[in-house]
Amino acid sequence: MDSKYDTLIYNVRIASMQHNGMPYGELPPTAIAIKEGHIVALLSCDEQLNDALQQTSTVIDGSRLIPCNENEQPTLPWLLPGFIDCHTHLVYGGNRAEEFEMRLQGASYVEIAERGGGIKGTVKKTRQADEQTLLNTAIKRAMRLCEEGVTTIEVKSGYGLDVDTEIRMLSVAKSLEKHLPVTIQTTYLGAHALPNEFNHDADAYIDFICRDALPQIASLGLADAVDVFCETIGFSLQQTERVFSCAKQYGLPVKAHVEQLSDSKGAVLAAKYGALSVDHIEYLVDSDIPSLVKSETVAVLLPGAFYYLSEVQKPPVEALRAHNVPIAVATDFNPGSSPLASLLTALNMSCVLFKLTPEEALRGATEHAASALGLNDRGVVDIGNVADLTLWDIETPAELVYCINGHRPIAVFKDGKHV
């Protein structure tokens, strides 16, 4: 006879991220019952627990996970949802370490580009890399995130800018699921930069995206969303809208890099198209925030890029709070402006640099990060959700944000399986 539950986790403190009036959505003493990869019950009384213990294949007793002396009271670990990094560019060729040295020696962006650096240097190296090379390096990068309890990662293309390489990047991203205990959400970011072959004709490149690249990628099912870098050094509002309109024709939700370097009104346009998220948003003005409320768009903060580029304009966190706009936090892991392979460090940065609270930061890597990807089945410990869970040897969830590179989970469950 089959067991009622596949796994039961008990003797843990649970930061559920539910909105129950408790910090971090802490639950009273509760056991989590898992069946077929999902949370199917939250058991809060001894009678329920005793019954469940007799009907479960695998039992995890949290009080046995943290070593203690014989006469000491066992320390109960904290259980949180698996983390979600909702904005990365971790599939690419080469690196930009040499460019980093040049920057520190005073070289300008133009000088670096003239020497073959910058985003076009990464495009060249990515185009030259075969699929296996891209996969091998992407596995190493994604593994760093997974080691911190990340169980879902968004991965963008955008370093190919031609059809073949963009397809190769997205295929590599999807295949990470075969090698690591992680869910991958892919985003087509063809409108990331203007490739050399279009000779400064951005409109012609947008024609190419809408006529050739996006239809092929959509037909192959390689993209879960479409993104655009809408900025003075990226693409205009009109060009961005053309890509958004095309994405909608293929049933793909949109996201946007906006207001990183200027107030381009990209956030308002993204909201018009019901964007899942607007990312960066350092130059977002207060008067544009109501449009995000109306479209239920998530504001994604990327403190790694802010730090790495020595930016000074901070995102309008107070105004976002005042309007109850959900705030997510991500690494923006990329070779040029945020080579950051640590979501926990990004959470610390979001507090130190942008003044989020630790709870806001942790919700930004769980509940709100899930919303930024259009996923309503994770990011919160609740019945019906995917059993992506992490266990930590900490006294309070705030420790995960407060301590830089100080914690790794003592256990991770992906789709209910202990990995």
UniProtKB/Swiss-Prot annotation:
It comes from the Bacteria. It is found in: Cytoplasm. Keywords: Cytoplasm, Histidine metabolism, Hydrolase, Iron, Metal-binding, Zinc. It is an enzyme of class 3 (hydrolase). It catalyses: 4-imidazolone-5-propanoate + H2O = N-formimidoyl-L-glutamate. GO terms for biological process: L-histidine catabolic process to glutamate and formamide; L-histidine catabolic process to glutamate and formate. N-formimidoyl-L-glutamate binds at residues 159, 334, 336. GO terms for cellular component: cytoplasm. Belongs to the metallo-dependent hydrolases superfamily. HutI family. Binds 1 zinc or iron ion per subunit. Fe(3+) binds at residues 87, 89, 257, 332. This is Imidazolonepropionase. Gene3D superfamilies: Metal-dependent hydrolases (3.20.20.140), Urease, subunit C, domain 1 (2.30.40.10). Zn(2+) binds at residues 87, 89, 257, 332. Catalyzes the hydrolytic cleavage of the carbon-nitrogen bond in imidazolone-5-propanoate to yield N-formimidoyl-L-glutamate. It is the third step in the universal histidine degradation pathway. Pathway: Amino-acid degradation; L-histidine degradation into L-glutamate; N-formimidoyl-L-glutamate from L-histidine: step 3/3. Its cofactor is Zn(2+); Fe(3+).
